[in-house]
């Protein structure tokens, strides 16, 4: 068989019963390396076909045929190939019954992907064989596009190593004294618009004396911090660094992002991802979502919502909805919180929705990536 394949003497064709779960339309083609892929779709699936990600990743020629239960058998007879594999993931019970009968009669191969078992199954002549599942490694953008969304290109500031230290300093100070930090950040945020546009921030000397213990612990945030010309003067290293102070959620998002990146376990990791729900061009009125941290691994989307303070059950529902929308049934919804809520009902709700909840104790120990990987083994 292998020698014949090398000399192209056998034509291998994959027939894919189209599935609303787009990832499943891609896996069999990746697994089998066929010479032709034929997608069979129903009338109500027309809006799903010709997915750009699928067509870019499948190297074999592709064809599309619309079917109904009445026409399915005759369509199968028209398909060419010495070895015909039929992926039954997308068919309803009637379609699978028709395909199974045709497979027995014509000695077709029936195949399907076992995502939970990490196996690819092939049924032929009454026997079942298994292969290790080959799932294409996709970027965050590819997975989002696969499920109909589009990532918006935003001018995001990815801090360098110096900026990372600044973010870590801000988060550490907030963790030491959240109330003091809140008052400090509020004072910075209340500055006039002219100060917000510059790196230099000035206030009465009282501000410096009130918050000197915080300021001295932020050496990477400020290039200068002290009394000058009778006033308190703070010189931010960069305008973007002001956000690290005024919005504590930002340093916590970066902390989560860096934990994921540092693990080197994921195919792709991105930060503060803005997504157009319908794959459009972000025109006014288009539904969109911002995901705090997003990663991908073996074709699965990990959607992480970051909460630096208290959260409610709505936050759990929201991260679940976003993960399902942009990553399908294999997505991994995660809520990372820099607080231990000690609310058993929240834990129960997260478990009910299959949302991984990672709170302050684990985040401070930098266990986010480890816990996500362990979760993915059983979910």
What is the role of each PLM region?
Residues 97-99, 104-170:
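Mixed-charge intrinsically disordered linker/loop segments at interdomain junctions
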Residues 18-23, 43-44, 90-93, 310-311, ...:
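Short beta->alpha connector loops
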Residues 34-108, 112:
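A broadly used, surface-exposed interaction patch
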Residues 3-52:
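N-terminal beta-strand-loop-alpha-helix module at the start
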Residues 12-13, 36, 83-85, 300-302:
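Structural motif
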Residues 23, 142-379:
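Intrinsically disordered, low-complexity Ser/Thr/Pro/Gly-rich regulatory segments
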Residues 24-31, 51-52, 74-75, 98-102, ...:
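A short acidic, amphipathic alpha-helical/loop segment
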Residues 16-17, 59-72, 307-310, 361-362:
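Short beta->alpha junction loops
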């Amino acid at each position: 068989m292998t020698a014949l394949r090398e000399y192209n003497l056998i034509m291998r064709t994959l027939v894919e019963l189209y599935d609303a779960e787009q990832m499943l339309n891609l896996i069999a083609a990746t697994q089998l390396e066929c010479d032709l892929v034929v997608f069979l779709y129903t009338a109500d699936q027309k809006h799903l076909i010709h997915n750009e990600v699928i067509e870019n990743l499948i190297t074999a020629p592709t064809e599309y045929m619309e079917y109904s239960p009445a026409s399915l058998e005759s369509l199968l007879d028209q398909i060419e190939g010495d070895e015909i594999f039929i992926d039954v993931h997308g068919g309803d019970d009637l379609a699978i019954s028709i395909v199974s009968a045709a497979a027995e009669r014509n000695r077709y191969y029936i195949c399907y992907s076992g995502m939970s078992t990490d196996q690819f199954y092939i049924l032929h002549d009454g026997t079942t064989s298994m292969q290790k599942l080959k799932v294409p490694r996709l970027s965050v953008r590819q997975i989002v596009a696969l499920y109909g969304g589009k990532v918006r290109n935003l001018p995001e500031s990815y801090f360098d190593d110096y900026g990372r230290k600044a973010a870590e300093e801000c988060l550490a100070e907030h963790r030491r004294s959240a109330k003091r930090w809140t008052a400090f950040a509020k004072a910075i945020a209340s500055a006039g618009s002219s100060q917000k546009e510059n790196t230099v921030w000035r206030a009465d000397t009282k501000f410096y004396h009130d918050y000197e213990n915080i300021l001295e612990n932020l050496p990477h945030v400020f290039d200068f911090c002290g009394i000058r010309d009778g006033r308190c003067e703070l010189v931010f290293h960069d305008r973007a660094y002001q956000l690290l102070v005024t919005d504590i959620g930002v340093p916590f998002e970066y902390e989560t992002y860096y934990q994921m990146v540092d693990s080197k376990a994921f195919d792709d990791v991105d930060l503060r991802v803005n997504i157009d729900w319908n794959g459009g061009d972000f025109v006014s009125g288009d539904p969109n979502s911002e995901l705090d941290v997003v990663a991908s691994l073996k074709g699965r989307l990990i959607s992480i919502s970051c909460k630096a303070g208290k959260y409610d059950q709505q936050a759990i529902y929201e991260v679940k909805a976003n993960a399902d929308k942009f990553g399908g049934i294999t997505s991994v919804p995660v809520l990372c919180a820099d607080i231990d809520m000690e609310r058993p009902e929240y834990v129960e709700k997260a478990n009910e929705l299959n949302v991984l909840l990672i709170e302050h104790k684990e985040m401070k120990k930098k266990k986010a990536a480890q816990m996500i990987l362990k979760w993915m083994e059983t979910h």
